[in-house]
């Protein structure tokens, strides 16, 4: 006989996930959220918690936090039928900006309660979901560098800087919706206009049914690293990062040599890579 699998006798139809680490989460804001969503099961964000065991299969999930928390929830529930409401409390709020969600808490709460449900576009690279972008090569290393700079994690910053310095130009070949080849320091496939510390990568939005391939979102190590660190430390979102872009639904990338692949700011392996735009099963709660 196998071991029994325990689940709560009842699951909630509404769940509020709070991130206490979000920059905009104050005691006053938390109290306002708890009052407004008193009819929800309220939990603190814990990436190791089995949230699926707490919520009914089509129950509404409202997440209040920064990009890391919000996008964790979106990736986790990408293939489910849950409606997801977002209350942005981070510094950059890349996904919320891309979806046209308000930054004001009162407006965001109204939409999270009674917004229009709509599927959005999510990216997948070798089966791994990404919300903002897939980056191959130096740009991916730089995203991680920018995150460490943003958080002032100087120990990690040194290690990430070493990865950036070690990055080299590679040969690439594209097939599928885009046919082409060449040499590059990095390739970027975006779903939002910015990533990480509001580092600009194009004009994409998850409201469109496609992703964008940036041909030269930073052509040299100095260009890419300079923009990443400047954006992270000064909280600036300049418009000089986007070069020529191509729209696509699916493509394959081969490189020589094999190069690291990042989904958002997470290392997910090395090339070759298959990258695709897919409509989410989950529905985001958006302005009507």
Give the location of each predicted region.
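ATP/pyrophosphate-binding catalytic subdomain of soluble kinases
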Residues: 126-215, 219
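A short, compositionally biased
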Residues: 114-121, 163-171, 246-248, 253-257, ...
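ATP/NTP phosphate-donor binding region
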Residues: 1-64, 71-79, 106-110, 284
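Short glycine-/acidic-enriched loop or helix-start segments at secondary-structure transitions
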Residues: 26-27, 72-75, 95-97, 198-199, ...
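ATP/nucleoside-binding phosphotransfer catalytic cores, i.e., glycine-rich phosphate-binding loops
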Residues: 2, 178-181, 215-288
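Short, glycine-/small-residue-rich phosphate/pyrophosphate-handling segment
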Residues: 91-132
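Hydrophobic alpha-helical segments that either span membranes
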Residues: 64, 69-79, 83-95, 102
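Short, well-ordered alpha-helical microsegments
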Residues: 51, 70-71, 196, 270
């Amino acid at each position: 006989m196998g071991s029994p699998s325990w689940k709560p006798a009842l699951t909630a139809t509404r769940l509020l996930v709070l991130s206490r680490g979000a920059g905009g989460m104050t005691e006053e804001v938390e109290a306002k959220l708890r009052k407004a969503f008193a009819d929800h099961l309220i939990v603190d964000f814990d990436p190791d918690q089995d949230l699926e065991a707490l919520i009914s299969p089509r129950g509404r999930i409202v997440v209040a936090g920064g990009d890391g928390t919000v996008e964790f929830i979106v990736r986790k529930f990408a293939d489910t039928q849950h409606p997801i409401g977002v209350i942005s409390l981070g510094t950059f709020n890349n996904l919320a900006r891309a979806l046209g969600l308000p930054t004001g808490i009162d407006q965001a709460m109204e939409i999270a309660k009674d917004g229009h449900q709509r599927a959005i576009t999510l990216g997948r690279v070798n089966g791994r979901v990404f919300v903002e972008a897939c980056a191959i090569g130096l740009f991916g290393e730089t995203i991680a560098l920018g995150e460490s700079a943003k958080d002032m994690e100087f120990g990690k910053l040194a290690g990430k800087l070493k990865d950036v310095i070690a990055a080299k130009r590679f040969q690439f070949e594209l097939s599928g919706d885009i046919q082409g080849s060449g040499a590059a320091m990095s390739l970027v496939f975006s779903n939002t206009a910015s990533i990480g510390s509001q580092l600009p990568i194009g004009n994409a939005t998850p409201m469109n049914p496609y992703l964008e391939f940036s041909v030269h979102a930073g052509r040299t190590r100095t260009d890419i690293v300079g923009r990443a660190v400047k954006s992270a430390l000064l909280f600036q979102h300049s418009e000089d990062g986007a070069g020529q872009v191509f729209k696509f639904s699916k493509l394959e990338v081969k490189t020589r040599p094999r190069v690291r692949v990042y989904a958002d700011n997470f290392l997910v392996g090395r090339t070759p890579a298959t990258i695709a735009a897919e409509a989410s099963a989950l529905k985001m709660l958006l302005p009507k």
